[in-house]
Structure formats: C-alpha cells, structure tokens
Amino acid sequence: MASLLKVDQEVKLKVDSFRERITSEAEDLVANFFPKKLLELDSFLKEPILNIHDLTQIHSDMNLPVPDPILLTNSHDGLDGPTYKKRRLDECEEAFQGTKVFVMPNGMLKSNQQLVDIIEKVKPEIRLLIEKCNTVKMWVQLLIPRIEDGNNFGVSIQEETVAELRTVESEAASYLDQISRYYITRAKLVSKIAKYPHVEDYRRTVTEIDEKEYISLRLIISELRNQYVTLHDMILKNIEKIKRPRSSNAETLY
C-alpha cells in the first residue's frame, strides 16, 4: 500500500505521533475522565443553588419603577394648550440633537445575577464536553479499518459510536444557543418594560422566563451528567470491537 502513494517519512512520523497522542488521551478520557466528571456533575446537581423549590427566590428586581401618571389640566392665560405644548416640544428638540433613548432612573438594568452565576458555571462544562467528545470521536474514527468484504459487525459498532459522539456534540452546542436566546428574549422584554412601564404583563413575563431558564439550566446539567454516563458505559461495553473490529485489524488499518 505504501508503494501506491509516496509519503514523506518526516510527515508520516509526525502523523503517527499525533495518532498515538490522540489514542492515549482518548483512552484516558474514557477510563478516567468521564467517570470522574459524571460524579462531579452529580454532586453539582445536589448543591442548594440548583435545588430551589420556591422559584420566587430567583426573581430579580426590575429596577424600573412605575412612573406617576401624567395629569392633564386646562390651559390658562389665554394660551392655546396643544399649540403651546407643540411649540415648547419643538424648542426642546432643537436644543437637544442626537439619538433618542429611554432614560433609566436607577441606572443600568442588570441581568438576573443568580441565573448569571449558574450560567457562568454551566458554559465551561458544555464546552468541555464538546471538546472531549471531539477527541474520543477522532480516536474511534482512526480505528476504523479500510472498507472490504467480510465480517463488518465490529465496524458497524465503531460507526454507531461515532454517530453517538457526534449527536452528543450537537446537543451540547444547542445548549449554548439556548442560553444566548434567553439573554436576547429577556433583553427585548426589559426594553418593552422601559417603554411601557405601566403594563404588568411584561413584568410577569420576565419572571416567567427567569423561572423557565432556571429549570432549563438544571436540566442541562443533568443531561451533561447523563451523557458522560452513557458514553462511558457504551464505549466500555464495546471496547473490544471498537479497538479490534476485525481479527485481521492490524493488517487492514490505514
């Protein structure tokens, strides 16, 4: 096979070194890292911050007081009301040029700090799972032998393992999208409250979204733990077929 394709020996040595490094790292991940991480996440799920039953405890102050109602009075001193108001408003607009913005009486509108704290702990865990799955997936792909007739049952197990790892990667990436959507949706609602401070439904919707996100974050952590459990169990049960899909595997590997 080597005679069919000329390969630079120096490059070949570097590629072989890369394969050995991936193999060593992936086997350590499956044997040691996955079980340790699932226990760590299981412990995280038992922390008080993730076991709040009264969800009103995670509500945050909107920092947007309801303004006093505007009282309209009759015009006096012979001034025509609408015309006089329009002239005064025109004078103000001429004095202050630029983009119109809503003035927040109490400063910046902050996020729900309790949820932000949880999110900042969850995001690194999501990224870590994606990275580790990618390493293990590469390892299994490198173990797949060349295509040929015969008993390919072991190869099908390898392919199913790769597919499962790819699915876990995609699901983990979707968790990051979910977090981004939460921030965007909440920001739009808070902007609505700033514009329509007297509408109570907007304020209630923000608290509903915060409660929903809290439940979702706990579910994400639970799913991360379960994915480590599933991958560890699946690979260990099929490790023989994954590493040696065919009896002549040593001769048929690329």
From Swiss-Prot:
Subcellular location(s) of the protein: Nucleus; Cytoplasm
GO molecular function, one term: identical protein binding
PTM per Swiss-Prot/TrEMBL: Phosphorylated by MAP3K3. Phosphorylation at Ser-247 promotes its association with CCAR2. Acetylation at the major site Lys-195 is important for oligomerization and ability to degrade its target substrates. Deacetylated by SIRT1.
One cellular-component annotation, GO: nucleus
Modified residues (N-acetylalanine): 2
Modified residues (Phosphoserine): 17, 24, 247
Induction description: Up-regulated in thyroid carcinoma cells.
Name of one Pfam family that matches: PA28_C
GO biological process: apoptotic process; negative regulation of extrinsic apoptotic signaling pathway; regulation of G1/S transition of mitotic cell cycle; regulation of proteasomal protein catabolic process
N6-acetyllysine, modified sites: 195
UniProt keywords, alphabetically: Acetylation, Apoptosis, Cell cycle, Cytoplasm, Host-virus interaction, Nucleus, Phosphoprotein, Proteasome
Signal peptide interval: none
Family, per entry: Belongs to the PA28 family.
Annotated function: Subunit of the 11S REG-gamma (also called PA28-gamma) proteasome regulator, a doughnut-shaped homoheptamer which associates with the proteasome. 11S REG-gamma activates the trypsin-like catalytic subunit of the proteasome but inhibits the chymotrypsin-like and postglutamyl-preferring (PGPH) subunits. Facilitates the MDM2-p53/TP53 interaction which promotes ubiquitination- and MDM2-dependent proteasomal degradation of p53/TP53, limiting its accumulation and resulting in inhibited apoptosis after DNA damage. May also be involved in cell cycle regulation.
PANTHER family xref list: PROTEASOME ACTIVATOR COMPLEX SUBUNIT 3, PROTEASOME REGULATOR PA28
Subunit text: Homoheptamer; the stability of the heptamer is essential for the specific activation of the trypsine-like subunit and inhibition of the chymotrypsin-like and postglutamyl-preferring (PGPH) subunits of the proteasome. Interacts with p53/TP53 and MDM2. Interacts with MAP3K3. Associates with the proteasome. Interacts with CCAR2. Interacts with PSME3IP1 (via C-terminus); the interaction is direct and promotes the association of PSME3 with the 20S proteasome. Interacts with COIL; the interaction is inhibited by PSME3IP1.
Domain comment, as recorded: The C-terminal sequences affect heptamer stability and proteasome affinity.
Annotated protein name in UniProt: Proteasome activator complex subunit 3
Native source species: Homo sapiens (Human)
Gene name as annotated: PSME3
